[in-house]
Design a protein with these regions (language model features):
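Beta-strand-rich domains and repeat architectures in extracellular enzymes and scaffolds
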Residues: 38-65, 82-87
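Short coil/turn segments that connect the beta-strands within blades of beta-propeller domains
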Residues: 53-54, 92-93, 142-143, 184-185, ...
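Residue position within the beta-strands of beta-propeller blades
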Residues: 58, 97-98, 147, 189, ...
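Short, solvent-exposed loop/turn segments at conserved positions within beta-propeller repeat blades
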Residues: 104-111, 148-151, 189-190, 228-229
Length: 288
């Protein structure tokens, strides 16, 4: 396995503690079949989450998993074991991702660049940056896509669903990125030096008045959320200028996202929890 895949939550916890102390082509990359049976024990290292229709999609070190509405049992989606390091739902049935190929695909480069699925995760094809980019942080809103390339630390921005890119220097090492649902050029990043905001898609940055660090989620309602490495949830009603605690997930997070008004958090024990009340209370949404 890629060692960097498993240390990210630990690095996040370490960063939170440190801050507290301070005050292209169309190549087919995978063609899974329809969803298969119950989880086979291979669900590990959740890197990303998304909701399409009424189904929760779970992007992991061993491929894509799903949990339909009303079912907490996560099931493998198809046969691909590609390592999906970055994952985001562009719109219903259309996903973007990044990471590393299925070990059986020896003809693929180690970094898949940006890949997309237009059939709800059943098949994937290369969009751009094949062999060059490995997005460990990947977010989208409409046709706007932002990624943090782990190969060089750059923040990359696309306004055409990943066909072309602009490259920007981050203000510091980035853990997480969130897009303002009301303005696609306004983005926030959580870094090893705190939270920074950009009004122009990553070209320029200014620090916010906080030393918090963690995973960001920005629901459509306008309230911004930050999930710390200790599982504590913070909420901001003013775009990240001020924060207040709202609750806790009861574990160490590995992924965090918003869908509608709901929040979803993946934990290091490979469960996924959901909150419908702004992070105050959490219920189990999916488990191996």
């Amino acid at each position: 396995m890629h060692r960097r895949d498993v240390v990210r939550p630990v690095a996040l916890v370490a960063a939170v503690m440190a801050l507290a102390g301070c005050g292209g082509g169309a190549d087919q990359t995978a063609t899974p079949q329809a969803p298969s049976g119950p989880a086979d024990g291979g669900l590990e290292h959740i890197h990303g989450l998304g909701v399409s229709g009424e189904t929760l999609f779970i992007a992991t070190h061993t491929g894509l998993w799903t949990a339909p509405r009303g079912d907490v049992q996560a099931r493998r989606f198809g046969s691909s074991r590609q390592d999906i390091m970055g994952f985001s739902v562009l719109r219903e049935g259309r996903f973007v991702g990044s990471g590393h190929p299925d070990p059986s695909q020896t003809d693929q480069p180690p970094n898949l660049g940006l890949i997309e699925s237009r059939d709800g995760g059943r098949s994937w094809r290369s969009v751009s940056l094949r062999g060059d980019a490995d997005f460990h942080v990947l977010q989208s809103a409409g046709n706007s896509v932002y990624g943090v390339n782990s190969a060089n630390g750059q923040i990359m921005a696309s306004s055409d669903a990943g066909r072309s890119w602009q490259r920007h220097k981050p203000p510091a090492g980035v853990f997480s990125l969130a897009i303002d649902p009301r303005a696609g050029k306004r983005i926030l990043v959580s870094t090893e030096r705190g939270v920074f905001a950009s009004q122009n898609g990553g070209e320029q940055w200014r620090p916010l008045r906080t030393r918090l660090a963690g995973l960001l989620a920005w629901p459509a309602g306008g309230r911004l959320y930050l999930l710390g490495g200790d599982g504590a949830v913070q909420m901001s009603a003013d775009g990240g200028q001020t924060w207040k605690p709202t609750g806790a997930i009861g574990g160490e997070p590995t992924a965090f996202m918003a869908h509608g008004a709901d929040l979803y958090a993946a934990l290091s024990d490979n469960t996924v929890k959901r909150s419908a009340d702004g992070g105050r209370t959490w219920t189990l949404r999916a488990a191996p």
